[in-house]
């Protein structure tokens, strides 16, 4: 005998469906194992991995997705502290400019727009700004900003609006599009970028995203930090719930489990459960975005792994491995 559709039963049905959706999202979470080709430019070899997103484009086309290049330069124009920082960070990222140059050249040779999802620079320095300017001087770029774009010394202070403001203007002057929010249509597909590097979505960004949805075009969102999905959470944590996921919009029950320790007053921000905790606007944005049928895909970085996880009924989220590792994704859009 079917249950009467009263308010309580409807609530129970919705709870069951949400639970099933979460299980399906986790089941279909995958580490991307895509078709890969190699490309060499001036002695530097990169790997290009192919993925496909079906969105309903006016005609098929491709873009090159790169993230986390981490330029690591400093010179006499910077402080001694910054020069030492560059030397230390360069131990694992010293070839970042030759690699991003090879990736850019691949895009130019194949007439591909480049979608870069943040952390082009590892920290703000005059030498890094010059290097970023060289990189952006050629090619067709769509850029989202990462958390490192405005980092002065990498992890030395609380990252918030006031911290970002210290270097925002000089960074924005070098980059090819607005770093807070930007949109561009290619072959009937609306590419939207927004700054979520500090794990927050602002009310202004939320309002602008609603306006983009109202255009009625299929949307591919490009951002630095991945949006929370149960599948990506599983891939990153591998059963260890204390491991931070680096995702935006994670439920409080998830972030509260992240490893943290007692700190002195004013230093609590150093704990990931505080740093990555979503505010009300961010949680509301995340829930709202999952319901938007216009959203067809998300391109992101930050976590330095290749993955494809289900964000919503209409959109998968693709993270790409760190660009300084010589990896990028050729995204074919249909």
Identify the meaning behind each predicted range.
Residues 41-55, 125-218, 234, 238-254, ...:
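Extended active-site neighborhood of metal-dependent phosphoesterases/phosphodiesterases
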Residues 68, 118-119, 146-147, 224, ...:
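Active-site glycine-centered loops adjacent to acidic/histidine catalytic or metal-binding residues
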Residues 9-21:
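Bacterial N-terminal signal peptides that target proteins for export
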Residues 1-9:
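Short, Lys/Arg-enriched N-terminal segments with co-localized hydrophobic residues
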Residues 19-29:
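Bacterial N-terminal signal peptides
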Residues 67-98, 151-174, 231, 274:
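Acidic/histidine-rich helix-loop elements
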Residues 102-113, 192, 199-307:
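His/acidic metal-ligating clusters that form di-metal
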Residues 34-127:
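N-terminal active-site segment of His-dependent metallophosphoesterases
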């Amino acid at each position: 005998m079917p249950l009467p559709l009263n308010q309580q039963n409807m609530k129970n049905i919705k709870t069951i469906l949400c639970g099933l959706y979460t299980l399906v999202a986790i089941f279909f979470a995958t580490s991307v194992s895509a078709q890969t080709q190699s490309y060499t430019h001036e002695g530097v070899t990169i790997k290009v991995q192919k993925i496909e997103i079906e969105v309903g484009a006016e005609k098929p086309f491709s873009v090159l997705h790169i993230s986390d290049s981490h330029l690591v330069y400093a010179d006499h124009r910077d402080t001694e502290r910054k020069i030492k920082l560059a030397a230390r960070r360069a131990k694992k990222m010293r070839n970042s400019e030759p690699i991003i140059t090879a990736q850019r050249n691949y895009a130019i040779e194949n007439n591909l727009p480049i979608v870069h999802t943040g952390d082009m620079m590892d920290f703000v320095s005059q030498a890094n700004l010059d290097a970023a300017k060289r990189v952006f001087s050629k090619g067709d770029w769509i850029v989202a900003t990462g958390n490192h774009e405005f980092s002065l010394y990498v992890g030395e202070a609380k990252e918030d609006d006031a911290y970002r403001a210290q270097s925002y203007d000089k960074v924005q002057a070098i980059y090819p599009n607005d770093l807070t929010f930007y949109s561009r249509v290619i072959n009937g597909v609306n590419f939207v970028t927004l700054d979520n590097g500090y794990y927050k979505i602002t009310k202004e960004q939320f309002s602008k995203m609603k306006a983009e949805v109202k255009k009625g075009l299929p949307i591919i969102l490009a951002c630095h930090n991945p949006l929370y999905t149960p599948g990506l959470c599983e891939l990153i944590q591998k059963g260890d719930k204390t491991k931070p996921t680096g995702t935006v919009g994670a439920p409080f029950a998830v972030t509260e489990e992240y490893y943290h320790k007692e700190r002195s007053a004013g230093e609590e921000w150093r704990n990931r459960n505080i740093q990555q905790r979503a505010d009300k606007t961010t949680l509301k944005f995340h829930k709202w975005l999952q319901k938007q049928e216009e959203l067809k895909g998300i391109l992101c970085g930050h976590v330095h792994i290749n993955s494809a996880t289900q964000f919503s009924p209409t959109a998968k989220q693709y993270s790409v491995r760190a660009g300084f590792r010589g990896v990028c994704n050729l995204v074919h859009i249909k």
